[in-house]
Amino acid sequence: MSVEIPAEWKKFRYRGKSLEELLNMPMDDFIKLLPARQRRSLRKGFTPSERTLIEKIRKIRRDSKADKPIKTHVRSLVILPEMVGLKFAVYNGKQFVEFQVVPEMIGHYLGEFSIPIQKVEHGEPGLKATRSSLFMAMKG
């Protein structure tokens, strides 16, 4: 599973390890580098949906046809070094949010880059919307 690494990614280090070292590292050694929450998540094993997504990622890497983003509803998968360079479209409950995985995202969850909540900006309340607006002069 060879991966082309752009020049700007060669300088990247995760806990003192380069991207090439992370790609060649066994999964058990990589898990030891992660923070506790992600380490525990990976030690428990992959769910069936996470497993099918990882198989799909490996198939795309093997066939080297990574032109389209990989659509998924799986938000709980930790980003692994083998995902670097691929495009994902993660569902946020309403739509698919596209992003490309860069080395700085290793160790984060896919769902962190597909925010499901939008900030609500309310306008002015309308006439009779509140008790105090009953006594306001009519507009217009």
UniProtKB/Swiss-Prot annotation:
InterPro entries according to UniProt: Ribosomal_uS19, Ribosomal_uS19_euk/arc, Ribosomal_uS19_SF
GO MF annotation list: rRNA binding; structural constituent of ribosome
Gene Ontology annotations for the cellular component aspect, listed alphabetically: cytosolic small ribosomal subunit
Entry keyword set: Ribonucleoprotein, Ribosomal protein, RNA-binding, rRNA-binding
SUPFAM superfamilies membership: Ribosomal protein S19
Gene Ontology biological process terms, A to Z: ribosomal small subunit assembly; translation
Cross-referenced Pfam families: Ribosomal_S19
Its biological purpose: Protein S19 forms a complex with S13 that binds strongly to the 16S ribosomal RNA.
Similarity comment text for this entry: Belongs to the universal ribosomal protein uS19 family.
Protein name: Small ribosomal subunit protein uS19
Naturally occurring in which organism (per UniProt): Metallosphaera sedula (strain ATCC 51363 / DSM 5348 / JCM 9185 / NBRC 15509 / TH2)
Gene name for this UniProt entry: rps19
